[in-house]
């Protein structure tokens, strides 16, 4: 079994003194999955890049969830599947390190539902985020105990696995108070590690922790923080931070010493998210807040298709939804012809 490192968003301050905002995923050199052949995971396009320093997760055709500590807001560009969408509205969740953002021009085919159960501890997860990967191995007595974080220019989507170990309520980090779920970055081999064991690192804040239930992937957490390490004699001094992830003790690498990682606990905020999610303008198939000829051309592409499936139902053209595009869907589309959503 192979550990991977998930990084957090780059921030000036470090969370909880001994943890820091997450930035990216790091894996063991021989343990990174091939996303082209690894299918037991969420769709890659449910994870996006938030601005230039974090990640986010699509939870509707035009909205993403992310953390707050990395900054950004209205006007931030979110990149999903190679397309950049500007943020036009933001809703923040009370004191939590959590926000919902609406994307202009988005009608995303891939998005995930929320994991609303409170039985997360013990469940295996897939973690996804954009950020740096594993760099040089850290060794003592010819044993690897961790990894440097790779060059900060090396940012791409990475996915790995882990297992939620615990949960905590009202955890304070910077100016936020947030319910969290907690995992750790285990060593390779038998024990607590998972197949593609991973931990966040730079630019992974806001990336997803996903649980599979009834063959459906749901969002259980948003990467928030990882354990920090400092140069000797400079504990908790951000000027002497070590951009590393450990899974064994550096002074005795025979012994395990896994770094901790945590995420915003989605089940605690599911009601707020569901109540806040804005609706999608019926018939607006390209997400520009107008129902016009461009939307009709998209509708025509799917006309008489019989393979519309959740979550997107042929980009929303199958309005019933019942799996096919027929006269009833056309009548529904016509009823909303030239409708417009007012600017937020």
Q: What does each of the following model-derived ranges do?
A:
Residues 7-17:
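Bacterial N-terminal signal peptides
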Residues 25-48, 54-70, 159, 194, ...:
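C-terminal subregion of chymotrypsin/trypsin-like serine protease catalytic domains
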Residues 18-24:
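Sec/Tat signal peptide C-region and signal peptidase I cleavage site
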Residues 104-199, 223-231:
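Chymotrypsin/trypsin-fold serine protease catalytic domain
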Residues 60-61, 65-96, 106-108, 119-126, ...:
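Catalytic-histidine neighborhood of serine endopeptidases
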Residues 69-76, 104-109, 130-135, 166-170, ...:
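Acidic glycine-/aspartate-rich tracts in secreted/extracellular proteins
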